Amino acid sequence: MHELSLCEGILQILEEQSRTQGFIQVHRVCLEIGALASVEPEALRFHFDVVTQGTLAEGSHLEIVTVPAQAWCLPCGEKVSVGQYFDACPQCGSRQLQVIAGEELRIQQLEVE
């Protein structure tokens, strides 16, 4: 259920940006969520609708873009796609991978008034 606290944090960012940028309403929020971020998109959508009620983001559309997980294989030097932590490198079989994408959760774009 950490999606609720994530949505509260997103709303806090929107409110801070509203004060500094001068917008009064949010129409669309586009989030990038990494495949390894342990975030359930449907739960996030549900909590976003609940948390934004009565705020500048009420009724806004939440768009979620999933960022595929990628890692750097230390032994063979290849950039590879991974499905989960501790996957083996599909090129050489090593498990010495450093994740370079797929853990993020960030606001990519806002549509505001």
Curated annotation (Swiss-Prot):
Keywords carried by this UniProt record: Metal-binding, Nickel, Zinc
Binding site residues for Ni(2+) = H2
Give one GO biological process term.
protein modification process
* GO molecular function per UniProt: nickel cation binding; zinc ion binding
Q: Which residues does the record give as Zn(2+) binding sites?
A: C73, C76, C89, C92
Record Pfam families: HypA
- What is stated as this protein's family in its record? Belongs to the HypA/HybF family.
Q: According to its UniProt entry, what is the function of this protein? A: Involved in the maturation of [NiFe] hydrogenases. Required for nickel insertion into the metal center of the hydrogenase.
Protein name listed in UniProt: Hydrogenase maturation factor HypA
Query: Species name for this entry?
Result: Acidithiobacillus ferrooxidans (strain ATCC 23270 / DSM 14882 / CIP 104768 / NCIMB 8455)
